[in-house]
Amino acid sequence: MILRTAKEIEDARAAAMCVVETHRRLAGWLRVGHTLAEVDAFCGSIFEELKCKSAFIGYKVRGHPPFRSHTCLSVNDMVVHGEHDATPLAEGDLLALDIGVKHRGMIGDAAWTYSIGSATEMGKRLQACGRESLRRGIAAIKAGRPMIEWAKAVQGYVERDCRFHLVRGLGGHGIGHTLHESPYIANTPPSYPGEWTEAWKPFEKGMLIAVEPMISAGTTEIRSKGNAWPIWTADGSLSVHYEADVMVTDDGCEVFTAALDELPDVVGGKA
């Protein structure tokens, strides 16, 4: 684990607050009829005002072109990694906004899901499940506890209590000077040897991590198209994504993005 200095921790808090403020402004601005391109451009303008930079635009991984949006915009059955286009938001859409910034040399990275204009019954259930699963998972984090305790708490609530599904193959991660650092933090316990090798490693005091349940109404499986970034639920069912930045402490954790929990589930009307 990388030990962080007091300044790095303070800078990480500041980066997280840039993410929170961006979500706040978006929640007050989003409307039915806004296109994903307009949403992304608005995010970019907020970043400029807050003097932070997108951690996503231009991001590269093997086999994919550089990511071309300021933020990840994923609608309905798209789980994560959606890019901007001319698609207008419709009444009842579920929009997962994953916002990542670099500010003062540190990363802030948090996602929240909004119903646009009004919420469907399934949308309400998924959003409530996503919010609560994040809270329950965070409550299981404490220095000295194995990371699998996070996954047990999240999976137990989502799959047993809510009867929804955590998508497999996607999870949280360490944050710091770069977007994706170790450790990898799965949302479900490993089902075979080698699936999640860090599951029994303990959380350590001072760890900076982004934890993020990604929940589907109908399946654990996901699909993608060639080298394109977006990832969808395999069966076309609705999904939600919630993510928080936390620092592990001796008696639990400090949630840098705690103010996101004050955001509304339903935003906007017609533009």
Task: Set out the residue ranges of the language-model regions.
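Active-site neighborhoods and metal-handling regions in enzymes and metal-associated proteins
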Residues: 1-271
